[in-house]
Structures are given as C-alpha cells and as structure tokens.
C-alpha cells in the first residue's frame, strides 16, 4: 500500500501484517508515523488523548487506501489507561507486535512555576505510561519471539532543553528505560530503541522564532515530522539495531 506523499513507501517485511500501536497519533509526528507504518503494511491502533479528530481522520484515510487502522482514546495521565489501551487494541486488532510510544506532555514552566501536580502529570504521560505499555506487551512479544518497542524522546534528555526540568527528567528516564529493556529482551527477538528529535515543524518543539532557530541549525532548516517517521521505520525494520538512542536534530547537538 502506498500512502500519499510517502517517499518511503517500500514495504518492510518485518512490519507487514504486524499490529502496531502508536500513542500521540493526533500530533504531527504521530500522524507521520501512522502514514509510514501503514505504508509498511502494519495494522494500526492510533491512540489519542483529548484531541481525537486528527487520529480519526488518519484512520479513515488509511482505510480508504486499503490499510487497517482504528482510533483508540486514552488519557495517559491515568495509571489504568495503558492497560485499557492495550486491551482495546488487542480486542480490535490482536496482540501488539510494535509499540511506538510517542505521546508526551510539553508544558513550558520554570523551576519556580512547577507544582508537584505538574511534575506528576509530566512523569505520568512521558515516562510512566511508556513503561506500563511496554510492561503489558512484552510477555506476548517474548512468547511470539518478535517485538519492536520505540520510545520517542527528545534532545532535552541530553541537554536539559527549554521546556522545563520536569520535561527533561521525564525524557531522560526514557533513555534509562530503553537501555534496561533492550539488554534483557534482545535474546527474545525484541528490539528496544529511542529517538530523540528536536526542532521539528508541526510540533511543540520550537522554543522561539523559527527563523532564528533555522539560522542556528547546521543543515539550515527545521526538521519535518516525516523525517522522524522515516527514521522510525528504518529502526523498527532492523532486527540487529537495539539499545540505541538516536538523535535527530539537524546536527545541532552533537554527541
């Protein structure tokens, strides 16, 4: 199946027919991930929070072009939501083979402005929910001898970023989770990786004037959600790549 505007529409044998759950499917990166995974032949659960229209529209678009997709609502601030989301996905599509944990909060606050409830919400969505989702899908992946887990992090995990300490801490936690899971699951055919994008259009990743930011980026422009999705497909389709956190920032933050 070829999705509109997809330069990376070649099917990945590793992903064709697999059930893939994407959280944050209403955002710019989530939408691009959905289109790329559909083009790779995956059957999709598109999870969304408060804003369901984009995820529902994307599901309809994928179905209209011959693919399989269902929108699923989940408030990932709730500790019960990840289990309910996995259950709903499995009821509609079957066991989850590919987990792309992309949902995230990014409320900008200074150290002085952050209440304990703000910190708790950030950790709940950005770190606890990815862990709980992975915890639910790993047993089935291990039993089937195949699994792909991809966490969408941020360069804020490396640099501290500009959103706030609660955001940076939550994203840094994802890197630790990635490394812990990857080492222990590799022998079961499960890969675990993370992407750390920055300065992507159509997202909340732009801490300032786009023109000023563009001038500071070595490649001379902002990134596109489709470029994040292209990298995600390459990572998910590679059985030898695991335990990696890959930056995608136009060369702005060398590591």
Language model feature labels by segment:
Residues 139, 183-184:
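Alpha-helical segment proximal to the catalytic Tyr-Lys
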Residues 134, 170, 178:
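Active-site helix of classical SDR
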Residues 42-57:
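Conserved glycine-rich Rossmann-like NAD(P)H-binding loop of the short-chain dehydrogenase/reductase
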Residues 110-111, 118-123, 213:
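Substrate-binding pocket helix/loop in short-chain dehydrogenase/reductase
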Residues 224-248, 253:
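C-terminal substrate-recognition "lid" of short-chain dehydrogenase/reductases
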Residues 19, 26-27:
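Conserved glycine-rich cofactor-binding loop
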Residues 154:
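Residue(s) in the substrate-gating loop at a strand-loop-helix junction
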């Amino acid at each position: 199946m070829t999705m509109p505007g997809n330069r990376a529409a070649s099917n990945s044998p590793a992903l064709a027919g697999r059930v893939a759950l994407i959280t944050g499917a209403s955002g710019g990166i989530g939408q691009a991930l959905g289109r790329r995974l559909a083009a790779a032949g995956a059957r999709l659960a598109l999870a969304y929070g408060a804003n369901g229209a984009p995820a529902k529209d994307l599901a309809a678009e994928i179905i209209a072009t011959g693919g399989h997709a269902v929108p699923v609502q989940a408030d990932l601030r709730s500790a019960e939501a990840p289990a309910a989301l996995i259950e709903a996905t499995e009821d509609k599509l079957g066991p989850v083979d590919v987990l792309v944990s992309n949902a995230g909060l990014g409320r900008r606050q200074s150290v002085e402005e952050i209440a304990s409830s703000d910190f708790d919400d950030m950790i709940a969505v950005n770190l606890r929910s990815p862990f709980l989702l992975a915890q639910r899908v790993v047993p089935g992946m291990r039993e089937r001898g195949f699994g792909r887990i991809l966490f969408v992090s941020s360069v804020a995990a490396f640099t501290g970023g500009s959103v706030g300490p609660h955001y940076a801490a939550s994203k840094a936690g994802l890197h630790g989770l990635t490394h812990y899971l990857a080492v222990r699951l590799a022998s079961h055919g499960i890969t675990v990786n993370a992407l750390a994008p920055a300065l992507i259009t159509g997202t909340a990743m732009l801490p300032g004037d786009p023109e000023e930011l563009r001038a500071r980026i070595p490649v001379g422009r902002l990134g596109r959600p489709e470029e994040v999705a292209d990298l995600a497909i390459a990572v998910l389709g590679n059985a030898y790549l695991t335990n990696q956190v890959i930056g995608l920032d136009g060369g702005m933050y060398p590591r």
